Amino acid sequence: MNECHYDKHMDFFYNRSNTDTVDDWTGTKLVIVLCVGTFFCLFIFFSNSLVIAAVIKNRKFHFPFYYLLANLAAADFFAGIAYVFLMFNTGPVSKTLTVNRWFLRQGLLDSSLTASLTNLLVIAVERHMSIMRMRVHSNLTKKRVTLLILLVWAIAIFMGAVPTLGWNCLCNISACSSLAPIYSRSYLVFWTVSNLMAFLIMVVVYLRIYVYVKRKTNVLSPHTSGSISRRRTPMKLMKTVMTVLGAFVVCWTPGLVVLLLDGLNCRQCGVQHVKRWFLLLALLNSVVNPIIYSYKDEDMYGTMKKMICCFSQENPERRPSRIPSTVLSRSDTGSQYIEDSISQGAVCNKSTS
């Protein structure tokens, strides 16, 4: 029967995994990582709070897509909390942690990733429902959106708690990983592979929607008389969502690959030398998301700017490169326009034949 080590401190597990946490987290490297991490976290709290407040304040954003976007901002805000907790419980402090405190530290990080990933999956479903029906916004009710948001956080909390619930190596030291000394290598493989598969599924779904919208836009454009901005609205919205997805994949994939290599017990891969920099890269994702929202959406930018600078609502600054949310947020108007475009296109094709 294997001996369990619930009462041990983390120095016992770090020493067995040959992880030199003290040397790596002292001196210039530690100062750089902590300074950059602190700046990122402050920006995450500020910018994502603005996004959530903008969705609450501006009635143009009171639609399912923007509610889910606000929830993604909430997930990024939660990621900032997780990284702050990590910064206060890392370096030389890591070896003094109890098992339960270390589980909490890692569980917060795991939950933040799962919340963002699951939320992107829900947004993919919402976009698929609306675009395939040629509507700017889906017909999800507020009740259903609320249930989806609660489901996102329930899944995130559960995934973050799985190691604490028993999938760990406290009773089987030989199965412990190197980067996460009390996580089983089998759990790391499961967790990373499931996340990478979710990445792949999302990329395929969004590419399918993107190709569909692009094809429909090209077919309908010659037969419709609406403004260019309105004709291109579905494509612009898809480009915004795909930019968010692309940033998420780029920022998180390297870290997941490193964890997968550790789970596969790759001793020659040098995972210890890059883990902290890839962790900062993952943190960067929560930094760039609010920038993407404000850059791509004209009204989001205007609302956030007015909250910061107290500018007059009657004279918002215009930036033509962004999506006019007055078009995006009027679901019935946008949907009717697309439906009218389909009808006009059908009439033109019929008369031509």
UniProtKB/Swiss-Prot annotation:
Lipidated residues (S-palmitoyl cysteine): C309
Residues modified by glycosylation: N15, N172
Name of the featured protein: Lysophosphatidic acid receptor 3
Location of this chain's protein in the cell: Cell membrane
Gene behind the chain: LPAR3
Extracellular topological intervals: 1-31, 89-101, 168-186, 262-276
SUPFAM superfamilies: Family A G protein-coupled receptor-like
Topological domain spans for side Cytoplasmic: 53-67, 125-146, 208-240, 298-353
